Amino acid sequence: KNCPACRLRKCCQAGMVLGGRKFKKFNKVRVMRALDAVAVPQPVGLPNESQALTQRITFSPNQEIQLFPPLINLLLSIEPDVIYAGYDNTKPETSSSLLTSLNHLAERQLLSVVKWSKSLPGFRNLHIDDQITLIQYSWMSLMVFGLGWRSYKHVSGQMLYFAPDLILNEQRMKESSFYS
């Protein structure tokens, strides 16, 4: 009764959701399948409960162990495509051309964030006002995290990797009007 995971599972089995709305559109079978797909891990037992623990954790030799939980697999499958800035390296660089390219890139990335969030499990079940609020409060963090991740992944954090066609090193950044 005191285990939060067990209480959550029982509430979900009864048709309750975190947002406070009941599953009106879903039948009980769909709800149970969704709960099975995103299983809550059981608490680990103490050493004196080893017999009960071995009864809960038994694997047959031919049973495969999942390396990635279903939620991680889902997130990997909805990973957004690579977005290009449309920056023309052949033209002389001016602060307005760089700023224009960054604005166009931010617009494309924002659309990508909205599309990505709509494909997240449970996001569309939220009220539309809640969806808008979540995107309003998180878009900048998601975009900055994406910039940091791309910079780390592609150029080992030595440059700012905005897009494959717009990578700024420290010297180029100092030469731009953004640095001062």
UniProtKB/Swiss-Prot annotation:
GO molecular function, one term: DNA binding
Keyword Phosphoprotein part of the UniProt annotation: yes
Highest taxon of source: Eukaryota
PTM annotation: Phosphorylated on multiple serine sites. Several of these sites are hormone-dependent.
Residues at which progesterone binds: R150
Cellular component aspect of the GO annotation: cytoplasm; nucleus
PROSITE patterns in the cross-refs: NR_LBD
Keyword Zinc: yes
Compartment(s) of residence: Nucleus; Cytoplasm
Keywords in alphabetical order: Cytoplasm, DNA-binding, Lipid-binding, Lipoprotein, Metal-binding, Nucleus, Palmitate, Phosphoprotein, Receptor, Steroid-binding, Transcription, Transcription regulation, Ubl conjugation, Zinc, Zinc-finger
Zn-finger region bounds: NR C4-type: 1-11
Segments passing through the bilayer: none
InterPro entries xrefs: NHR-like_dom_sf, Nucl_hrmn_rcpt_lig-bd, Nuclear_hormone_rcpt_NR3, Nuclear_hrmn_rcpt
Domain notes: Composed of three domains: a modulating N-terminal domain, a DNA-binding domain and a C-terminal ligand-binding domain.
Record-given protein name: Progesterone receptor
Native organism: Notamacropus eugenii (Tammar wallaby)
Taxonomic classification: Eukaryota, Metazoa, Chordata, Craniata, Vertebrata
